[in-house]
Amino acid sequence: MESVITATIIGASLLLAFAALGTAIGFAILGGKFLESSSRQPELASSLQTKMFIVAGLLDAIAMIAVGISLLFIFANPFIDLLK
C-alpha cells in the first residue's frame, strides 16, 4: 500500500514539474515571437497583443489542469481502491 502512495506522489510531482516546465517554455517562445512580430510590423502590435494574451491564458490553463489532476491523485487516490 505504501508503494502505491509513494508512486502516486512521485507521479503527481513529475506531472506538476513537467507542466511548469512546459508552461515556462511556452511563455518564453510566445514572448519571443510576439516581440519579433511586433518589431517587424509595429502597426499590428495591438492585434498581436490581444492574441498573445489569449494564448497565454490557454498556456496557464494547461498548468491549472495539471494541478487539478495532481490534487485528485494525492487526495482522492483512485489506485488505493484497487488494492482492496
Curated annotation (Swiss-Prot):
Major site of localization recorded for this protein: membrane
Record's subcellular location: Cell inner membrane
Lineage: superkingdom: Bacteria
Gene3D superfamilies: F1F0 ATP synthase subunit C
Cell membrane among keywords: yes
Transmembrane segments: 9-29, 54-74
Keywords per UniProt: ATP synthesis, Cell inner membrane, Cell membrane, CF(0), Hydrogen ion transport, Ion transport, Lipid-binding, Membrane, Transmembrane, Transmembrane helix, Transport
Presence of keyword Transcription: no
Record GO terms (molecular function): lipid binding; proton-transporting ATP synthase activity, rotational mechanism
Cellular component terms (Gene Ontology): plasma membrane; proton-transporting ATP synthase complex; proton-transporting two-sector ATPase complex, proton-transporting domain
CDD domains in alphabetical order: ATP-synt_Fo_c_ATPE
Family: Belongs to the ATPase C chain family.
Protein name: ATP synthase subunit c
Lineage of the species this protein comes from: Bacteria, Pseudomonadati, Pseudomonadota, Gammaproteobacteria, Pasteurellales
